[in-house]
Amino acid sequence: MSAQDSIPYLQIRVDGICQVTPTHFTKTIQFRDINYQLSDNEDKQAIFDGWCDFLNYFDSSIKFQFSFVNLTALRESFARAIPLRSDQFESIQRELSKIIEVQQAKGNNGIVKTKYLTFGIDADNIRSAKPRLERIETDILNNFKRLGVSAEVLNGQERGPAPHAPSPPAAKPEPFTFRWEDLPRSGLSTKDYIAPSSFLFSRAKDFRMGKKFASVSFLQILAPELSDRILKDFLDIESNIVVNIHVQSVDQVSAIKTIKRTITDLDKSKIEEQKKAVRAGYDMDIIPSDLATYGAEAKKLLSDLQSRNQRMFLVTFLILNTADNKRQLDNNVFQTNSIAQKYNCQLTQLDYQQEEGMVSSLPLGLNQIEIQRGLTSSGVAIFVPFTTQELFQDSPEALYYGINAL
């Protein structure tokens, strides 16, 4: 079995459509940041409400995945970005290069942050999948535009580095080199460019990816309420980290029926407890506290779905940590778990499911971890993917160098 076999998709097409299984097809959109954390409360609420509406677009036929990839940039990549030229601005260019080197040694340690949204549908073949994927793509881009978010769809050439993203720190320090026209005459597939040199899944809670150590954990959402800073705090960790949120919308009618059945079952249990109380000779209003709590929460959830424009979603929250050695990996996982505990959640390393976790951490729209938490639209939206807009100029005519406020 080769490293390529651990990356389970069938093909990536030139237009960016990935055939993950014979009947499941996905596309990926890369989106940018907007100002959220620096905004006042009124603007934050407007962005949050808009993000809830964004999530409500996805019905039960569309599976989608948010991927937040933080990887340390190589020093050589900065050098290639600003090649020295012998002209009248050479001294200024050297000064700029020195500033970048100094900032790379501190601050965010040269971490490059990218955000992806991968969405997928089931279809009999690519012919029937393509027009529907294109309609969904147009709707998503328009919804991003309403939020003021810049976004673009990745084609096959651009999408190659997306699943490749966890691999460079693991095994491939060289830049990603891939040209579509090379495939026919080389006899290679896109997996040969994406896969690291090797995978080793012999341990229960971590694995090897090339020369690097890695571990996938899932977030147990135990808190009754979460802060909108939890995702930001995870992504502020100054190490290689990939956060993935897999989301599946539940059919609205089915969700309401399920909750109504739950309320009926809780009411039956309440009546049984009251009968026991009468037979025992004590106040029938005294019922187990858990029963009262669950009943109130179920009724509130039903009200949210019926009257507050909320949908029901099933969410899987995964975090992939990578490091140069086992000790550093353990420290990174410990630091990530500390943030989870800060918000009354628990981060648990997957036990003998590291390969499935690795696959689910690739932006392919494929979730192989069946650990899900039901959340409403506002519950999913609390993982706000925005902090502050990047002031970044990568053109040859860039005019200034600066540091973001956050």
Q: What do these predicted ranges mean?
A:
Residues 23, 383-406:
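Active-site-adjacent "gating/activation" loops or surface patches in catalytic cores
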Residues 1-388:
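Extended, folded cores of ATP/NTP-driven motor/assembly subunits in large transport
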